């Protein structure tokens, strides 16, 4: 396995499966991560996952990705989407392409969730498709970093 993709999960995503399942679904974060790792392995891609409820820890993990040769980041910034200039600056600072993913359709929710500090810099945004959004993002990421991959 050569290329690496990093999946970052933001605050409260450790509660998936328990927190508001009518909004976020019934799968746990562990279920989602296992599915993504299996999907990446089929394409001979190394996939790392990271979750934190702390903005600074997520910023540190993004910085670390640059030294690890990560080719693409899939990020669900959760509530930090709407508040974190630090997260935006970290992603721009490492210059690793990223895809923004949200389980729920943030545009169909409260007005404060409609703004993202990341979307205008992301290569793509997927929202409202539940856990399947991560899988779609990973499909695209694999294609992006391995254009000749037949999968």
Swiss-Prot record:
<dbReference type="GO" id="GO:0003855">
    <property type="term" value="F:3-dehydroquinate dehydratase activity"/>
</dbReference>
<dbReference type="InterPro" id="IPR036441">
    <property type="entry name" value="DHquinase_II_sf"/>
</dbReference>
<keyword id="KW-0456">Lyase</keyword>
<protein>
    <recommendedName>
        <fullName>3-dehydroquinate dehydratase</fullName>
        <ecNumber>4.2.1.10</ecNumber>
    </recommendedName>
</protein>
<feature type="binding site">
    <location>
        <position position="82"/>
    </location>
    <ligand>
        <name>substrate</name>
    </ligand>
</feature>
<keyword id="KW-0028">Amino-acid biosynthesis</keyword>
<keyword id="KW-0057">Aromatic amino acid biosynthesis</keyword>
<comment type="pathway">
    <text>Metabolic intermediate biosynthesis; chorismate biosynthesis; chorismate from D-erythrose 4-phosphate and phosphoenolpyruvate: step 3/7.</text>
</comment>
<comment type="subunit">
    <text>Homododecamer.</text>
</comment>
<dbReference type="GO" id="GO:0008652">
    <property type="term" value="P:amino acid biosynthetic process"/>
</dbReference>
<comment type="similarity">
    <text>Belongs to the type-II 3-dehydroquinase family.</text>
</comment>
<comment type="function">
    <text>Catalyzes a trans-dehydration via an enolate intermediate.</text>
</comment>
<dbReference type="GO" id="GO:0009423">
    <property type="term" value="P:chorismate biosynthetic process"/>
</dbReference>
<dbReference type="GO" id="GO:0019631">
    <property type="term" value="P:quinate catabolic process"/>
</dbReference>
<dbReference type="GO" id="GO:0009073">
    <property type="term" value="P:aromatic amino acid family biosynthetic process"/>
</dbReference>
<feature type="binding site">
    <location>
        <begin position="103"/>
        <end position="104"/>
    </location>
    <ligand>
        <name>substrate</name>
    </ligand>
</feature>
<feature type="binding site">
    <location>
        <position position="89"/>
    </location>
    <ligand>
        <name>substrate</name>
    </ligand>
</feature>
<dbReference type="InterPro" id="IPR018509">
    <property type="entry name" value="DHquinase_II_CS"/>
</dbReference>
<dbReference type="Pfam" id="PF01220">
    <property type="entry name" value="DHquinase_II"/>
</dbReference>
<dbReference type="InterPro" id="IPR001874">
    <property type="entry name" value="DHquinase_II"/>
</dbReference>
<feature type="active site" description="Proton acceptor">
    <location>
        <position position="24"/>
    </location>
</feature>
<feature type="binding site">
    <location>
        <position position="113"/>
    </location>
    <ligand>
        <name>substrate</name>
    </ligand>
</feature>
<feature type="binding site">
    <location>
        <position position="76"/>
    </location>
    <ligand>
        <name>substrate</name>
    </ligand>
</feature>
<feature type="site" description="Transition state stabilizer">
    <location>
        <position position="19"/>
    </location>
</feature>
<feature type="active site" description="Proton donor">
    <location>
        <position position="102"/>
    </location>
</feature>
